């Protein structure tokens, strides 16, 4: 009958409308409703440290299993004594960006405009370099006290400075480069490497009084190198007191390792 067909058509129309509305509502819910599994419920194995700052943090150093420092922009220094559960801000006494921190008996920090800070336990002592540019890295082969220590720092425009005998000596004229030097590492008071912009690798065996350029692989000479470490070092009690290998990392995933031994690697 016509009424039956009309009734059947209405049913089909209602069914289509219900299905369409259901899909439309589901789409809206998926679009605007947060995921049922929140980020907090996903265990990534990482927790955010409770440091309240918007400043970039440029370096971090663990002194032992419980104590660590984090440093960064605008002279910010943070310290934890309970394995990162709590962090307290320390007064650095400076507003310059801090770029690197090292420890050899005492924590030492370098930063922009020649900033050098030394931790004496409860506070930071300024030992900055007048006239120096931005300092990017440091190496501390010897530290007994400020008066009895050897510290090397590197920075902009080929700058390398050495602290010894209670004074800073400018070694920049000996580096043979005006490239920024981003990293420096010494295994003792005499032997060290420094790396920087445009594939720069230089080495010294006389405490920085002279530096020799080390050829980097040709394909990496346009890249900047950001860090260097000397490992496998043989100490004075061994037959050959020289670095065994040098590892350098840098731009575009660069990782290169010396294939020779000793300071001529």
Which residue ranges define each predicted feature?
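Residue-level hotspots at or immediately adjacent to binding/recognition sites across diverse folds
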Residues: 38-265
């Amino acid at each position: 009958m016509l009424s039956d067909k009309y009734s059947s058509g209405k049913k089909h129309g209602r069914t289509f409308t219900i299905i369409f509305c259901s899909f439309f509502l589901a789409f809206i819910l998926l679009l605007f409703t947060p995921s049922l599994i929140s980020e907090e419920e996903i265990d990534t194995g990482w927790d955010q440290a409770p440091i309240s700052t918007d400043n970039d943090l440029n370096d971090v150093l663990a002194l032992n299993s419980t104590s660590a420092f984090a440093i960064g922009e605008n002279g910010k220094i943070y310290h934890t004594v309970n394995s990162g559960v709590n962090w307290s801000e320390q007064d650095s006494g400076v507003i310059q960006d801090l770029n690197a921190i090292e420890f050899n008996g005492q924590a030492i920090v370098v930063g922009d405009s020649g900033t050098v800070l030394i931790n004496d336990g409860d506070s930071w002592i300024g030992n900055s370099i007048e006239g120096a540019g931005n300092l990017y890295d440091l190496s501390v082969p010897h530290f007994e006290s400020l008066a009895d220590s050897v510290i090397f720092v590197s920075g902009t425009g080929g700058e390398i400075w050495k602290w010894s005998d209670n004074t800073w000596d400018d070694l920049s004229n000996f580096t043979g480069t005006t490239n920024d030097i981003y990293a420096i590492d010494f295994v003792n008071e005499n032997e060290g490497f420094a790396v920087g912009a445009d594939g720069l690798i230089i080495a010294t065996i006389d405490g920085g009084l002279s530096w020799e350029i080390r050829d980097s692989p040709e394909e990496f000479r346009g890249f900047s190198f950001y860090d260097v470490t000397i490992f496998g070092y043989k100490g004075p009690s061994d037959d050959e007191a020289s670095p065994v290998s040098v590892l350098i990392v840098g731009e575009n995933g660069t990782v290169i390792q010396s294939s020779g031994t000793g300071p001529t690697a």
